[in-house]
Amino acid sequence: FLYYFGLSFAGLSAIIDIDENKEIIFGDELTIDHIVWMGTQPTLKEKSERVGIRETLPSAGIISYLHKAVQKGQTVHYLPPYRPEHKLKLMDWLGVPPARQEGSVPFIRAVVAQRNYKSAEEIAEIEKACDVTADMHIKAMEVIRPGMYEYEVVAEMNRVAEMNNCELSFPTIATINGQTLHNHYHGNKIKSGDLFLIDAGAELPSGYCGDMSS
């Protein structure tokens, strides 16, 4: 969603309507309850206009929009869903049972072809993410000492990410028990002679990520 529409907020859906030559973002504006906790925020329409999308509709509007498209005989393309709630939404929106939601092969191929190409701006973002990721690993090498706990090393790595306005690409693996795949426990004490495995990465606000092992 972020790649095609430039927004990263929960509860949004979008349609690229090729026949009508327009893009629509579906979502609900913040209520007073949200504003009390979060303060005044740009409206969904304002956020959408910043990324070049002029038309917004409430979340519920996507159902009638898709139903009309199906009635007109338009082909509705979608990517294979992997989250169960999205499978249920597609069943509600298009009447396609979860077992038959295989996605559109032409759409899949089009997305793959597009994502294989990287613009100069994208490459710069990827390089930034990799630079911050490398700095995280270097910091771990600089601070690690026998007697430290794994979580102390992880804290230093997280600090590097935060200092560069980055989130983590995924939960950090930093462990003396590298023989266990995807070990996210950080409570072991590091001893002299231990082999310390790190798999970690930084994610930029743009969504581009680094992923390195050391």
Write out the residue ranges for each language-model feature.
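A composition/biophysics-driven feature that prefers long, compositionally simple stretches
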Residues: F1-D135
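Short catalytic-site patches enriched in acidic/histidine residues
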Residues: F1, V105-A110, M148-S214
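Active-site pocket-lining segments that scaffold enzyme catalytic pockets across diverse folds
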Residues: K118-E142, M148-N165, F170
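Short, charged/polar low-complexity linear motifs in solvent-exposed/disordered segments
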Residues: Q41-L44, V143, A200-G201
